[in-house]
Amino acid sequence: MSSFRLGVSRVARQVRAPCVRNTRRYASDSHAPADHTHSAAGHGEHHHANAADANEELGTAFYVIFGAIPAFGALYYFSRPGKDGQPNSITKWLQKWEEHQEALADKNALVTAALEQAAHDKHLFYYVDQLRSGHYEMKYPEVFQHGSARNVPAGTYIPLDKVVEVYRKQHLDEEERKAKKLAAAN
C-alpha cells in the first residue's frame, strides 16, 4: 500500500503544471502613476518622501516639571516658620478658614435654636386650651417611629394601635363638631 501511495504522488507531481510566477512588485511602484516613465537622472530623486522637520515641541511633561520646580520652591518658602517661632503663612491662612467655619457653625446653631423656639411658640398658641388641661400635642406624629416601614424585623417597633385609636377618635369628634356647626349656621 505504501508503494502505491508513493507512485501516485510521483505521477501527480509530474502531471501538475509548473506554476507561473508573478513578477515581483516593489513598494516604490505602488504609488507611481500609470504613465510613469523613468527619467535619465535615474531612480534616485522622485520616489522618496521628504524627511520630517526637526523642530519638535517640548511637550506637556516638560512644562509640568518646569512649573513644578518653582511651585515647590514657593511651597517650601511659605511653609517655613516665621521669626521668633511665629506660624507660617499656610497655617495662618488655614486658621482664617477655621475661624470662618466656626462663625458659620455658631450662626447655624442660632438659626436652628430660633426655628425650634418658633415651632414651640406656635404649639403654645395653637394648643393653649389643651395645655390648660395638661395635654400637649406632638410636634409631628412621626416622632414615635423614625425609619423605614420596610425590612423591619418583627417586634422592633412598639405597637401604636392605642395611639392610632386616640387620634382617630379625636378626628371623628372634630368632624362631628364641624358638622354641627355647619348645620347650626344653615
Curated annotation (Swiss-Prot):
GO-annotated molecular function: NADH dehydrogenase (ubiquinone) activity
What is this entry's stated membrane topology? Single-pass membrane protein
What function is annotated for this protein? Transfer of electrons from NADH to the respiratory chain. The immediate electron acceptor for the enzyme is believed to be ubiquinone.
Instruction: Supply the source organism's classification.
Output: Eukaryota, Fungi, Dikarya, Ascomycota, Pezizomycotina
Subcellular location per UniProt equals:
Mitochondrion inner membrane
- GO CC list: mitochondrial inner membrane
User: Could you tell me which residues form the transit peptide?
Assistant: 1-26
- The principal location of this protein is mitochondrion
Q: Transmembrane segments in this chain: where?
A: 58-78
Chain intervals for the UniProt region annotation (Disordered) = 22-49
Enzymatic reactions: a ubiquinone + NADH + 5 H(+)(in) = a ubiquinol + NAD(+) + 4 H(+)(out)
Write down the EC number.
7.1.1.2
* Basic and acidic residues: compositionally biased ranges: 26-49
Quote the protein name from its UniProt record: NADH-ubiquinone oxidoreductase 17.8 kDa subunit, mitochondrial
